[in-house]
Amino acid sequence: EKRKNMNYSECIENARTRIGNYCKACPECNGRACKNQMPGPGAKGVGDTAIRNYDKWKEIRVQMDTIAENKPVDTSLELFGKKFKYPFFAGPVGAVGLHYGDCLDDVAYNDILVSSCAKYGIAAFTGDGVDSNVMVAATKAIKKTDGIGIPTVKPWNLDVIAGKMEMVHESKALAVAMDIDAAGLPFLKNMEPPAGSKTVEELRQIAKMAGTPFIVKGVMTVKGALKAKEAGASAIVVSNHG
């Protein structure tokens, strides 16, 4: 079935009937309407972290300079030997049904996201979760695009991570990430053996397991960036998990 093109307002209006109870499909995704809800995109505790993140992003502007050759602007980016059309990727979401309603399951969501990003010249980060099928679906979707996608593995214990990395290898993913800013999630801390925070040495072991460029997502300080570099990370993502 051929779908009509939608403008942003129509997209938001349509989303409100499909996206579940946590995300409110706001015109401006600023963390205010969804704060202090778990699960969901808003922040826990006093609920201002996602809000402060968004407010800080608004301070960043592209500097205009029109004194240049009159030709199309090159927005491309080269990363890990691959060239992308634009310098932004789709962020990772795991357990889609839990967070964003039952309109799409993880298999359908990842198939749409990963293939569409690859088709239009960027790449998708994919998520992870307590349901092992989340990573299975993500890596299968990435394999279909010849590795144009980046699985994001949660900071489980090392045995669980090793199993996840096998799926990453099978997918031929261009890189793999770990969202170390998920270290405080209760379902990780309550595992046996405990999961969560990782030392430099543990991250070094994980980077070796990866066998592909390893991205540490969840670095907020210079000290953290230097630790990630010491552990053998190929890149970092500045993030605090919202």
Locate each region found by the language model:
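Alpha-helix N-cap and loop-to-helix initiation/capping positions
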Residues: 45, 105-108, 193-198
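N-terminal functional module of multi-domain proteins
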Residues: 49-135
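An N-cap/entry alpha-helix motif that binds or orients negatively charged groups
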Residues: 3-84
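Alpha/beta enzyme core
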Residues: 115, 144, 156-242
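Hydrophobic faces of well-ordered beta-strands that scaffold small-molecule active sites
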Residues: 88-91, 122-126, 147-153, 176, ...
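Long, hydrophobic, well-ordered secondary-structure blocks that form the structural core
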Residues: 123, 134-159
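Glycine- and other small-residue-rich loops at beta-strand/loop junctions that grip anionic moieties
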Residues: 42, 102, 126-129, 153-154, ...
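Active-site mouth loops of central-metabolism enzymes
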Residues: 91-106, 150-159, 212-220
